[in-house]
C-alpha cells in the first residue's frame, strides 16, 4: 500500500513538473536533473539530498549510494516519507503541491536526511551517521541527533535553528516551528535527560522544552515558551516558565479541513528566527 501511495505522489509531481516546464523554461535543466531523470520518488529525493550534503571529501555519488541502499534495505522508511510530505501539504498554508517540499523546503529535507542517519545509527554505522548529522546541521541549520526517534507525519516548518537531542522521542503528527530546542537541563547526564513529545503536539517558534519531561498528545506550546515540567494532553501552555492558559481540542484540530486547521499552526509561528 505504501508503494502505491508513493507512486501516486510521484505521478502527481511529474504532472506538475510537465506544466512548469512550459511556464518556467529557464528551470528546465533544474527540473530535468532533480525530477525527470529519475524513475521514482526515492531516487529523486536521494539525488536532491546528496547534492546538498556532499563535499569535496565525500562525493555526491557516494552519498546517493548510501541513501539508495537504505531505501532498498528498509522499506518502512517509505511510509515515513509519505506521511511526512503529506503532513507538509496538509498543515503548511504556503504549500499546495508535493513538488514544493521535495525541491525547496529544508525542513522536509533535514527530516528525511535525519531518517537515513537514524537508520545508520541503529545498524551500527555510528561514525557515518554522525558525519551525516554534521552535514545536515551545516547545510540546513537543523541539528537532530541520529539516536533520537521521530515518528511519521512530522512537519518541521521553516526549520532554522531546530535542535533535537539524543534521547528525544517524538510521536506521529507533530508540528515543530523554527528555533525550537528539545534538550536537557544540564543537570542530568543519563540517557533519559530529554523530553518525550506525544502525538499531535504543536511546538511554536523559539520554544524550549528541557529535561526528562512529557508533552501530552494534542498539546500546544506557545512561541518563545520555556517548558520545564510535564504538559497534560490537549492544553495550551505559554510563558517563561510555561503555564497552562487554555484547553484545546486535538480531535477538532485533526478533523477540520486545511484552511481551518492551519490557524492552530499560524498562531504559533511568531518568534525569533525566520
From Swiss-Prot:
Location, primary (coarse class): cytoplasm
Catalytic activity: L-serine + acetyl-CoA = O-acetyl-L-serine + CoA
GO molecular-function terms, A-Z: serine O-acetyltransferase activity
Broad class of enzyme this protein falls into: transferase
tRNA processing keyword on record: no
EC number annotated for this UniProt entry: 2.3.1.30
One Gene Ontology cellular component annotation held by this UniProt entry: cytoplasm
Record PANTHER family: SERINE ACETYLTRANSFERASE (PTHR42811)
Record protein name field: Serine acetyltransferase
Native species: Buchnera aphidicola subsp. Acyrthosiphon pisum (strain APS)
Amino acid at each position: 500500500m505504501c508503494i502505491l501511495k508513493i507512486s501516486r505522489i510521484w505521478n502527481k509531481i511529474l504532472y506538475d513538473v510537465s506544466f512548469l516546464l512550459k511556464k518556467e523554461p529557464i528551470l528546465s535543466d533544474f527540473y530535468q536533473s532533480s525530477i525527470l531523470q529519475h524513475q521514482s520518488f526515492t531516487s529523486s529525493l536521494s539525488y536532491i539530498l546528496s547534492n546538498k550534503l556532499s563535499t569535496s571529501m565525500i562525493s555526491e555519488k557516494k552519498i546517493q549510494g548510501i541513501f539508495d541502499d537504505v531505501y532498498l534495505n528498509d522499506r518502512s522508511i517509505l511510509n515515513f516519507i509519505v506521511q511526512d510530505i503529506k503532513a507538509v501539504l496538509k498543515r503548511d498554508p504556503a504549500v499546495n503541491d508535493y513538488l514544493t517540499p521535495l525541491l525547496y523546503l529544508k525542513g522536509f529535507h533535514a527530516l528525511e536526511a535525519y531518517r537515513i542517519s537514524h537508520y545508520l545509527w541503529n545498524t551500527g554505522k555510528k561514525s557515518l551517521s554522525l558525519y551525516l548529522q554534521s552535514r545536515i546541521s551545516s547545510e540546513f541549520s537543523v541539528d537532530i541527533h541520529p539516536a533520537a526517534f521521530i515518528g511519521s507525519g512530522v512537519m518541521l516548518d521553516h526549520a532554522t535553528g531546530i535542535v533535537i537531542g539524543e534521547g528525544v522521542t517524538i510521536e506521529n503528527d507533530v508540528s515543530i516551528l523554527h528555533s525550537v530546542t528539545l534538550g536537557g537541563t544540564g543537570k542530568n547526564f543519563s540517557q533519559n535527560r530529554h523530553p518525550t513529545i506525544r502525538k499531535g503536539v504543536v511546538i511554536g517558534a523559539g520554544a524550549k522544552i528541557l529535561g526528562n519531561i512529557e508533552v501530552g498528545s494534542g498539546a500546544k506550546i506557545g512561541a518563545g515558551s520555556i517548558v520545564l515540567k510535564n504538559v497534560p494532553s490537549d492544553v495550551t501552555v505559554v510563558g517563561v516558565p510555561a503555564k497552562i492558559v487554555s484547553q484545546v481540542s486535538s480531535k477538532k484540530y485533526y478533523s477540520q479541513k486545511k484552511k481551518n486547521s492551519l490557524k492552530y499552526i499560524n498562531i504559533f509561528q511568531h518568534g525569533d528566527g525566520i
